[in-house]
Amino acid sequence: MGRMIASTFMSRFSAAQLGYAAGLKGYLDRPASLEFLKTMDIKHSVGHWSAGDFCDRFAPPGYHSDDPGFGTDFESQCRRTKAAGVDAIEIHQSVFEKTMNGDLDPAAIERAQRGVLAELGMVVTTCNINTWTNPKFRLGGPCNPDPALRKAALEEVLKGVEICKLMKIPVLSVWPGSDGADYHFQIDYKQSIEWFTEALVTVNKECLKHGIKLAIEPKPYEPRELYMIIPTAASAILVAQQVNKASGGNNCGLTIDYGHQKMEATTASTACDLAAFAGIQVHKFDINDARQGRNDQDLMFGTISIPESVEYLYTTFVRDYRGYYSQDQFTYREDPTRAIERSMINFANLALKAVRIYANQPALDKARQAGTGPDVLDVVSPVLVG
């Protein structure tokens, strides 16, 4: 078993990459961070919303609404992301709808592809689905008690498939943001999760036709206050298994959000390993930070718990994850460009620590066999706090 684990773990980086990382000294600034991520082939992206304005119930107009020069359109979000040093961005299907949950806007897609994306040399890595902003979905999207609205929500997800086809986006990610319950007895959970699974089976069959990966993103609660329909990584894995069983293949997988796992009072590292144990792929990781058991804070990455962040990245390397780590952060009062840049630099520096622990796997394996905290800390602490 030890030899099998070592073989798996050593597949993520080449000897040349590990040698390069071993030669790096001190703190990585912005140029060094960008070079490190490129050399190590660690992919980094940003959700378009993280480069926009931010609203909450305390500042409904938006924290940057007093700045007439602050654009909130997709082009402005792309330009801020690129200015932060990141050349990959995620979208929602609603970015390319004529109105919220209205008709697709192929002309807008073409303008973006030929215009700002081409100009900046940017790629779109994931299409997410919004079935919560429109008030018609206030009681749910794919799990709405009204069958007509369940159908409308399914159509929104299928629009995402169409956008992926048109823009050659490899991943479609579904976070059911309005589905769940606020009160006990409000829904029949088994019925609701069956509706959700049935919708995803339909979507996954379309994804399979076009080589698009389908991901489910779990979250314990918020905006639904009792629970979301997919509240845990384990529940997402169960649904993905059912979707794959009904569709054939293993195309349906997970999006794991770092902060959502903190809300769940587990870790993104254990969620990654649980998916690997179950044979379910992780198609995307959302990075941010949050305090354990609190709300979805979406802070800049690496600002709360460095050991936990490093273990998470280490685990993704051990499990040979090669997709994108995408910023999903709501830095309400900050300049989004500076916040994106700061997260990227933090991410690169913590990824370097994770690579160094990864490269010292035999020592970590030996310490784990001893089973004590000090033995393990003897291996990792020089990297974490040295």
Segments from the language model and where they lie:
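N-terminal pre-domain/capping segments
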Residues: 2-170, 248-252, 344-386
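A short, acidic, amphipathic alpha-helical segment used as a generic capping/interface helix at domain edges
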Residues: 28-30, 270, 304-318
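Flexible, acidic glycine-rich loops studded with aromatic residues
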Residues: 96, 309-364
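Short, electropositive alpha-helical surface patch
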Residues: 102-120, 146-150, 181-194, 225-241, ...
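Active-site groove signature of glycoside hydrolases
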Residues: 164-185, 213-221
